[in-house]
């Protein structure tokens, strides 16, 4: 018998990933975000992240002392000297429901 994993265990594992990651639904609403991405988004956007549009606008015109180092490669330097490469890609869950995944590594 395969043991069931609780939602809390999944979220805890998601929060401890070394990459910053979040998922938006087909309407662009934030559905899942880990702690690292929350921290990055707060600096980049100046507030809590709510929508994909908010993040896209912040990536086009970063705030909080964030510097765009390479627009084509989506590489940003944060005030603490940390450099992140952002990727955006469509994904689907096991039911075929589409989401947008954003990662910063």
Tell where the protein language model's regions lie, with residue ranges.
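PAS-family sensory domains
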Residues: 41-45, 86-90, 96-105
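Sensory modules in modular signal-transduction proteins
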Residues: 2-32
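Flexible loop/coil segments at beta-strand boundaries within sensory signal-transduction domains
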Residues: 79, 91-97
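Terminal output helix/cap of sensory domains in signal transduction proteins
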Residues: 47-81, 85-87
């Amino acid at each position: 018998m395969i043991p069931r994993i609780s939602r809390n265990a999944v979220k805890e594992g998601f929060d401890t990933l070394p990459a910053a990651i979040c998922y938006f639904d087909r309407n662009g609403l934030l559905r899942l975000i880990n702690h690292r991405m929350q921290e990055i988004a707060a600096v980049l956007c100046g507030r809590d992240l709510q929508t994909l549009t908010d993040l896209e606008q912040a990536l086009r015109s970063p705030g909080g002392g964030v510097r765009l180092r390479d627009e084509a490669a989506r590489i940003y330097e944060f005030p603490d000297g940390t450099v992140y490469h952002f990727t955006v890609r469509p994904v689907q869950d096991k039911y075929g429901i589409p989401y947008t995944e954003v990662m910063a590594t």
